[in-house]
Amino acid sequence: MAVGKNKRMSKGKKGGKKKAVDPFTKKDWYDIKAPSMFSVRNIGKTLVSRTQGTKIASDGLKGRIFEISLADLNNDEDQSFRKMKLKCEDVQGKNVLTNFAGMDFTTDKIRSLVRKWFSLIECFVDVKTTDGYTLRVFCIGFTKRRMDQAKRTCYAQSAQIRKIRAKMVEIITRECTTCDLKELVLKFIPEVIGKEIEKSCAGIYPLQNVYIRKVKILKAPKFDLTKLMEVHGDYSGEAVGEAVARPVEEKAEETAEAAE
């Protein structure tokens, strides 16, 4: 039996083994800056590929949306159920300047509010702020037991629900159309609108847990750098980290070691 040459076995692979390249060597870190309406301005870092040819790094960052808990933005754990969306509007040096791009509730918070034997009332309304932003604002509220009530259930009648919903739309429209986006965000954080709805609807049916649960930006005005800088104020002088004071004992030990 003739032993032939097996062509498939003798053929070697074309080219040597490719060297593994770490993709992070071609990327840069940028600091994310929150608007001045929040107490914490340095909220984190983001990665982007370096400028290469016609591909500019800042173009890859613009339009990027970051979702951050309000608890981290304001150093307040009581506000952890609110999620804020911040959109990258401009890049200056290694700083990413963001602006408000929406708000939402965490799923567990919404589920904790919904209970049996109470009526749930929801509405949404499209509003336009004084600086040209068109927003869709979603509101949620629940009926509440009266002080002298013996009945177990707290169901509102259909006519009462319609009146409450109309009142919600009226208050949201009034509060949102008389201020700019920055002032409006400052109203959302302490739930000014929700408290106003509770107070106004007390005569129709007592309400509890009234919240602006979601805000969507439908249309934004043309980008203006001057307005963005007004929202951010002066961020250049801020330190990224906090200085930590070293104990005197450690310094004394180091000096003694150096002398030896």
Curated annotation (Swiss-Prot):
Chain positions covered by the region annotation Disordered: 1-20
Compartments, record wording: Cytoplasm
Annotated InterPro entries: Ribosomal_eS1, Ribosomal_eS1_CS, Ribosomal_eS1_euk
Pfam families: Ribosomal_S3Ae (PF01015)
One Gene Ontology cellular component: cytosolic small ribosomal subunit
GO BP terms in the entry: translation
Biased amino acid composition, Basic residues: 1-18
Primary site of residence: cytoplasm
Molecular function terms, GO-annotated: structural constituent of ribosome
Protein name: Small ribosomal subunit protein eS1
Annotated source species: Ostreococcus lucimarinus (strain CCE9901)
Organism ancestry: Eukaryota, Viridiplantae, Chlorophyta, Mamiellophyceae, Mamiellales
